[in-house]
Amino acid sequence: MVNLAAMVWRRLLRKRWVLALVFGLSLVYFLSSTFKQEERAVRDRNLLQVHDHNQPIPWKVQFNLGNSSRPSNQCRNSIQGKHLITDELGYVCERKDLLVNGCCNVNVPSTKQYCCDGCWPNGCCSAYEYCVSCCLQPNKQLLLERFLNRAAVAFQNLFMAVEDHFELCLAKCRTSSQSVQHENTYRDPIAKYCYGESPPELFPA
């Protein structure tokens, strides 16, 4: 029976339409996975997207993390960190302490909210996750609004594509051109993730 099944399978593989079908399904799966992973990056790069500039950014999150174990409470987070993760409520935690709802486990001692570890007074930080967490402090709202008002039109379109305070901090810390000295050189190779208005000091060449 096994030999018969193997023989039938080999005969099927010799047919071009079967190979084409297998290849097509594999290609669809690959493209679907790629598009899901790149969805946020594509939106950040869409400089030509049209938005209503009179619509204010909603700075308040829609739920309170007071009981983060509630299944109805879902958190977006910074996703890509290998060791650290920042959720949309400003908590930084180790990846292993991330709950299934996407929120950091606030009962773990190492989890910190609005953490500015490794961040300089100019708003530049040594780690992307700390940059986002520090940027999410409520008192940073005026600074971020001032930045948006001063941004060039094309640059402003990029940041107006975000929907709230969390997405603005994700984009600001990830795409800040102020931290670049030359094409492939950071002004400060240590504190290169910036949410603030002032660029880092020039690093000696």
From Swiss-Prot:
Disulfide bonds: none annotated. Residues 36-205 are lumenal. One of its GO terms (biological process) is positive regulation of SREBP signaling pathway. InterPro entries: SPRING1 (IPR019352). It comes from the Eukaryota. It is a single-pass membrane protein. The chain crosses the membrane at residues 17-35. Changing residue 67 to Q: Loss of glycosylation. It is found in: Golgi apparatus membrane. Belongs to the SPRING family. Positively regulates hepatic SREBP signaling pathway by modulating the proper localization of SCAP (SREBP cleavage-activating protein) to the endoplasmic reticulum, thereby controlling the level of functional SCAP. Interacts with SCAP. This is SREBP regulating gene protein.
